[in-house]
Design a protein with these regions (language model features):
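A long amphipathic alpha-helix within ATP-dependent nucleotide-binding catalytic cores
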Residues: 240-294, 330-357
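Peripheral (often C-terminal) accessory segments that flank ATP-dependent C-N-forming ligase machineries
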Residues: 321-381
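Phosphate-binding site of ATP-dependent enzymes
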Residues: 187-237, 285-299
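Conserved N-proximal alpha/beta basic substrate-recognition cap immediately N-terminal to
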Residues: 23-33, 45-149
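ATP-grasp fold ATP-binding core
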Residues: 156-177, 196-209, 301
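ATP-dependent carboxylate/phosphate-activation module, predominantly the ATP-grasp catalytic core
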Residues: 217-268, 303-330
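Glycine-rich phosphate-binding loop of ATP-grasp-fold ATP-dependent ligases
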Residues: 162-187, 213-214, 236-251
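N-terminal-proximal low-complexity accessory segments that begin disordered
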Residues: 2-35, 40-42
Length: 381
């Protein structure tokens, strides 16, 4: 099931938490994305997408799961089905009748959704890379740090050129950029509130990004840690998600493998296999350091859940090799605006398929009509 508000539920830590209505609408609108990562026999919690969308992706080789209501899902769980959410929370498990699992969602699991985890992982990664000539492109100048004292935070912010992040929230939310003098005082006031409420903030240097990527990993019950692939995406300076990228890799295959192996070794050292089972997405970035040398920062954010990268790794198989494409999620004025937009884009950028029925050019959509949120993309000509 698609529940990207899981981080809010984890922060709230109450079994009665309910996300804002607009985000509930967003979750319903985007539930169709789960079909891209479903397997035979799976059911997706949510309304079935429109027939046109289902047929389009079925012809591209996507498995079409059965879409079920929440009540039907609860019945299936009682009969032995396993609930696999986008991300876990006490509230989610409780609402689906899994009270024991909700009670087992301890403070330790809650810590896995804190940005402090990213600081710990990056520190371990840097220790692994330090002094090793073959890994010097991953040996970064400054690391992110957890700051719990107001005076230390203020000194860091007044130095400028930094990013201040709240401990809770992700995907570019809860972030203050400090690039100019006018940013300093508002950031300090904001960070004081976060330290008072959450106990700390994360401070990290600001780098002009050349590109961003997510290393996708899964930890299994038997203790295996598996590298699933590397995804590329576009975000703004604060790290807010913009677009998923297809055919626009910024790392070499060798670098992708190196980054994955470093992360797996770091997770093993931190003993995550005894504490967590499931998907992990570790965001990273490529930038030029002060000397103009290309650097790869392996860990800027850790997502202990599914990510859009998991979906994109599946979506990319539906495209002709070597094409360059992007897709994104957009909010429209209403459902009619989303439907009208699709009709106009279909006319302006007609779909072209290759001899294997894969997308070669044109406009495509990934989510259902009938909502004021839509996921859509285009293959660059």
């Amino acid at each position: 099931m698609y529940n990207p508000t899981c981080e809010m539920a984890v922060q709230n830590n109450s079994v009665s938490y309910q996300p804002p209505l607009r985000l509930q609408e967003f979750e319903r609108a985007m539930s169709s994305l789960m079909m891209f990562i479903s397997q035979e026999g799976d059911c997706v919690v949510g309304e079935a997408p429109d027939d046109e969308l289902l047929l389009f992706w079925k012809e591209r080789g996507v498995y079409l799961p059965q879409f079920v209501s929440k009540n039907d899902a609860i019945s299936l769980i009682k009969d032995g089905a396993i609930l696999i959410p986008w991300g876990g929370s006490r509230q989610l498990y409780y609402s689906y009748g899994l009270k024991q699992k909700s009670e087992q969602y301890t403070d330790l699991m809650r810590c896995f959704f804190s940005r402090e985890l990213s600081v710990v992982l990056e520190d371990t990664v840097c220790r692994l890379c330090q002094g090793r000539n073959n890994l010097k492109q991953y040996d970064i100048e400054e690391k992110s740090e957890l700051v719990t004292e107001r005076d230390i935070m203020e000194r860091r912010v007044r130095k400028g050129s930094c990013v201040v992040k709240s401990l809770w929230s992700s995907s570019g939310r809860g972030v203050q950029l400090v690039r100019e003098q006018c940013h300093i005082e508002p950031a300090i006031v904001w960070a004081r509130g976060k330290i008072r409420h959450d106990g700390g903030v994360v401070c990290e240097p600001f780098y002009k990004r050349l590109g961003e990527f997510t290393t996708l990993i899964e930890i299994y019950e038997d203790g295996r840690i598996e590298y699933l692939g590397t995804n590329y995406f576009e975000a703004d300076e604060a790290g807010r998600f913009g677009k998923e990228l297809i055919g626009q890799n910024i790392l070499t295959r060798e670098e992708e493998q190196e980054v994955a192996q470093i992360l797996i070794e770091a997770m093993s050292r931190l003993n995550w296999v005894e504490k967590y089972i499931g998907k992990i997405g570790v965001d990273g970035m490529v930038y030029n350091d002060k000397q103009g040398e290309r650097k790869v920062r392996i860990c800027t954010e850790v997502n202990m859940r599914h990510t859009m990268g998991n979906i994109n790794l599946s979506v990319v198989r539906c495209f002709s090799p070597k094409v360059k494409a992007t897709w994104q999620i957009e909010q429209f004025d209403n459902a009619m605006s989303w439907a009208r937009f699709c009709k106009e884009m279909d006319s302006r950028f007609p779909l072209v398929l290759d001899d294997k029925n894969r997308i070669e050019c044109g406009f495509f959509r990934l989510s259902s009509l009938g909502y004021n949120y839509g996921a859509w993309g285009i293959v660059q000509g």
